[in-house]
Curated annotation (Swiss-Prot):
This is Adenylosuccinate synthetase. InterPro entries: Adenylosuccin_syn_GTP-bd (IPR018220), Adenylosuccin_syn_Lys_AS (IPR033128), Adenylosuccinate_synth_dom1 (IPR042109), Adenylosuccinate_synth_dom2 (IPR042110), Adenylosuccinate_synth_dom3 (IPR042111), Adenylosuccinate_synthetase (IPR001114), P-loop_NTPase (IPR027417). It holds the Pfam family Adenylsucc_synt. It is found in: Cytoplasm.
C-alpha cells in the first residue's frame, strides 16, 4: 500500500522545500505541484550542479518519477516551455514524464502587465509581488473569466474569450494605469504555438492521481511558498494569491483529505522573509547580515535579498495547527555555526506588556509587538554536511531538542547543506 505525503513550508517560503522533495522522491513514484505559479523557485544542488525549478515538480530530476502540475497551479505557458527547454538542454527527458491539468488557469501577458503596473502605482504601499502575473491570474479564476489550459485546444472558443478578456484588461491598463495595451493578434499567434507544444502533456490530473493511489504508488505533494503567505491564514495583505496550507492539496489536486498519510513541515533553523510585511524577529544588526551572507539569502527567482531573523516558535505553533503537521524538517542549521548566542521567540509582548502566545491574524496587528525570547548557547563547531545526529555539537542538539519541546512535535529530518546527502533522516515520511 502506497503512502501520500505533503511537503509544505511553515514560514514565509524559501525554507528549502526543493531539496527535501528531491531527496524524498527516491521513495516516490509521483510528485505533484498543487498551487502557486512560477513566482517561487525551488533550488536543488546535485553533484555540485545547481538547478532552479519554478513550475516543474522537483521530482523531474529523478528518472523514474512521473510529475504532475495540478489544477490549483496558475500556469504561464511561456515560463513552462522555457523551463522544459532548459532541462532538456541538460539531458532531462521532461515531456514524457510531465502531465498538466486541463483545468489550470493560464497566466498571459496582460496578467504580467497588470501585476507590474499595480506595484508601480502603489509605490511605497506595494505588496512586493514578483511581477509575474500570479495575482491577476487568480483574480480572473475567482471572477470566473479565466482562460484555462483546456481552452487552448478549441481555437475559435479561445479566440472569442481572449478578445473579450483583452478588451477588459486593456481598458484597465491604458485608462487607469496609463500603460500600453497588449496586442491581440500577437498573443493569439503565440497561444496557438503553445497549444501544439502542450497538447501531448495534458490530462485529467485528479483522475490520474487516483489511479496511482489505487495501484499502491507513493505520491508526494510539493507545496510552494509557505504558510504565512497563504491568502487566508497569512499576514494579510502581505501574502500570495493562493492557499499555501495543506487544504490546498484537496482542492488544488482533487485529492480527498482522508488519503493524506503524512504532512512534513519544512522550517529553517532561523526565519526569513522576502518583500514587505510584518516580521517580529527580524534582525537589522550585524547578526542578521551574517545570517544572510552565510545562508546566501537571495530569492531563487527574483534575486531579491531576504530579511533574516531568529526562529519564531509562535508562528510555527500555528503552522502546525493549521496543517496537522506530522513532523518537521529543519534546514540550514549550518548557517548558525559560530554564533555565541541563539534566540527563539516563544511569545509576543504588546505595548501594554500583555503576553501573547498566538500570532495576530492581520498584518497591522503585528505593529508594536515585540518578541519574547528564550536564549540558548550557540556552538563553534561545524554542522555542515553532518549526516548522523550524534555527530552534531552538543549545543546544536540542545537547540533542536528545545524546538521540539516548545512546539510539541518531532523533528524527523534535518538538512545540514544543499546537497542531497547532507541530510539526517530520523523518521522517513514514507516509512
Amino acid at each position: 500500500m502506497g503512502k501520500n505525503v505533503v511537503v509544505l513550508g511553515t514560514q514565509w517560503g524559501d525554507e528549502g522545500k526543493g531539496k527535501i522533495v528531491d531527496l524524498l522522491t527516491q521513495d516516490a513514484q509521483v510528485v505533484v505541484r498543487y498551487q502557486g505559479g512560477h513566482n517561487a523557485g525551488h533550488t536543488l544542488k546535485i553533484n555540485g550542479v545547481k538547478t532552479v525549478l519554478r513550475l516543474i515538480p522537483s521530482g523531474m530530476l529523478r528518472p523514474n518519477v512521473t510529475c504532475y502540475i495540478a489544477n490549483g497551479v496558475v500556469l504561464s505557458p511561456q515560463a513552462l516551455l522555457s523551463e522544459i527547454k532548459e532541462l532538456e538542454g541538460n539531458g532531462i527527458n521532461v515531456r514524457e514524464r510531465l502531465r498538466i491539468s486541463l483545468a489550470c488557469p493560464l497566466i498571459l501577458p496582460y496578467h504580467i502587465a497588470l501585476d507590474k503596473a499595480r506595484e508601480t502605482h502603489m509605490g511605497k504601499s506595494a505588496i512586493g509581488t514578483t511581477g509575474r502575473g500570479i495575482g491577476p491570474a487568480y483574480e480572473d479564476k475567482v471572477a470566473r473569466r479565466a482562460l484555462r489550459v483546456g481552452d487552448l485546444f478549441h481555437r475559435d472558443r479561445f479566440a472569442n474569450k481572449l478578445t473579450e478578456l483583452l478588451d477588459y484588461h486593456n481598458f484597465v491598463l491604458t485608462q487607469y494605469f496609463k500603460q500600453p495595451a497588449v496586442d491581440l493578434e500577437s498573443l493569439l499567434g503565440e497561444s496557438l504555438q503553445w497549444a501544439e507544444e502542450l497538447r501531448p502533456m495534458v490530462c485529467d490530473v485528479s483522475a490520474c492521481l487516483h489511479e496511482h493511489r489505487k495501484q499502491g504508488e507513493n505520491i508526494l505533494f510539493e507545496g510552494a511558498q509557505g504558510v504565512y503567505l497563504d491568502i487566508d491564514h497569512g499576514t494579510y495583505p502581505y501574502v500570495t494569491s493562493s492557499n499555501t496550507c495543506v487544504g490546498s492539496v484537496i482542492n488544488g489536486a482533487g485529492f480527498g483529505p482522508r488519503y493524506i498519510d503524512y504532512v512534513l513541515g519544512i522550517t529553517k533553523a532561523y526565519t526569513t522573509r522576502v518583500g514587505g510585511g510584518p516580521f517580529p524577529t527580524e534582525l537589522l544588526d550585524d547578526v542578521g547580515k551574517r545570517i544572510a551572507e552565510r545562508g546566501q539569502e537571495f530569492g531563487a527567482v527574483t534575486g531579491r535579498p531576504r530579511r533574516c531573523g531568529w526562529f519564531d516558535a509562535v508562528l510555527l505553533k500555528r503552522s502546525i495547527e493549521l496543517n496537522s503537521i506530522s513532523g518537521l524538517c529543519v534546514t540550514k542549521l549550518d548557517v548558525l555555526d559560530g554564533l555565541e548566542v541563539l534566540r527563539i521567540a516563544v511569545a509576543y509582548k504588546d505595548r501594554d506588556g500583555n503576553i501573547l502566545s498566538r500570532p495576530p491574524l492581520a498584518a497591522d496587528d503585528f505593529n508594536d509587538l515585540l518578541p519574547v525570547y528564550e536564549e540558548l548557547p550557540g556552538w563553534q563547531e561545524s554542522t555542515a554536511d553532518v549526516t548522523v545526529m550524534s555527530d552534531l555539537p552538543a549545543n546544536a542538539r540542545a537547540y533542536l531538542k528545545r524546538i521540539e519541546e516548545i512546539l510539541g512535535i518531532p523533528i524527523d529530518m534535518l538538512s545540514t547543506g544543499p546537497e542531497r546527502d547532507s541530510t539526517i533522516t530520523l523518521r522517513g515520511p514514507f516509512l
